[in-house]
A protein has these predicted regions:
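Iron-sulfur-associated redox domains of electron-transfer enzymes in respiratory
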Residues: 1-130
Length: 130
């Protein structure tokens, strides 16, 4: 009989999805309906959860990540350039016992319509689950 902690280790965990919107006023998201986007991801994609954060790279975003990130989970962050995300979140991931190069799936969805961004997320999720 498996204990709960052993069961958690053996079952495949879905990726967590975070949409960082740069305060919600970034021109890079003007072609997208952010609420439709996050609700479609939450309801139709194979993610554990999906939510919007206003600005992960600000001080409160760093505090949020410090409390939120859990070991043994992957996180997809949709927002700015992947190189920037890795640089910004490296310490937060390391402090949580995570490897930003392995446990973060950063995607840039700026300047896309809702449908274009959904296509990128779905394709990336498929590739991540292989």
């Amino acid at each position: 009989m498996l204990l709960v902690s052993e069961l958690e280790k053996t079952e495949h965990r879905k990726i967590g999805f975070v949409f960082c919107v740069c305060t919600g006023k970034c021109a890079g998201f003007s072609k997208m309906d952010m609420w439709d986007f996050i609700n479609i991801i939450r309801a139709e994609c194979p993610v554990e959860y999906a939510f919007i954060h206003p600005m992960l790279c600000d001080e409160d975003g760093e505090r949020f990540l410090a409390e939120f990130l859990k070991k043994d989970r992957k996180y997809m962050v949709a927002g700015c350039a992947p190189i920037m995300q890795k640089k910004l979140f490296k310490d937060s991931f390391a402090n949580a016992g995570l490897d930003v190069n392995k446990d973060l799936v950063p995607i840039d969805i700026r300047n896309m319509t809702t449908q274009e961004a959904l296509a990128v997320v779905k394709k990336t999720l498929e590739e991540t689950q292989k």
